[in-house]
Amino acid sequence: MDKKTARLSRSKRTRIKLRELGHTRLCVYRTPRHVYAQVISGDGSTVLVAASTVEKDVKAKCKYTGNVESAAIVGEIIANRCKEKGISQVAFDRSGYKYHGRVKALAEAAREHGLQF
């Protein structure tokens, strides 16, 4: 089993558990150049809030979009957008990635700005 297949099987396992519980989840996806975050409803059918380093306002704030600082900016933006929509509590879906680096920075920035995991 290669790295990508192992990550996908880990993510599938956690998503099944989160869907059974019916919690709204903060889903993270990363590429070498960008970080994406979405808040998805409990049934998994609709995206309620989204933010990424592809957006112009995020690109203006950071020099490079594939690092820890830009992931923290995305975490801050996603938390603020959740507040506007009235979402205060989510389950963190790290998509099979290790809780380290950009994933950790995004999660901690979202927590600091009022989002509860």
Swiss-Prot record:
Gene3D superfamilies: 3.30.420.100. Pfam families: Ribosomal_L18p. GO terms for biological process: translation. GO terms for molecular function: 5S rRNA binding; structural constituent of ribosome. GO terms for cellular component: cytosolic large ribosomal subunit. InterPro entries: Ribosomal_uL18_bac-type, Ribosomal_uL18_bac/euk. It comes from the Bacteria. Keywords: Ribonucleoprotein, Ribosomal protein, RNA-binding, rRNA-binding. Belongs to the universal ribosomal protein uL18 family. This is one of the proteins that bind and probably mediate the attachment of the 5S RNA into the large ribosomal subunit, where it forms part of the central protuberance. Part of the 50S ribosomal subunit; part of the 5S rRNA/L5/L18/L25 subcomplex. Contacts the 5S and 23S rRNAs. This is Large ribosomal subunit protein uL18. The lineage of its organism: Bacteria, Pseudomonadati, Pseudomonadota, Gammaproteobacteria, Thiotrichales. The gene is rplR.
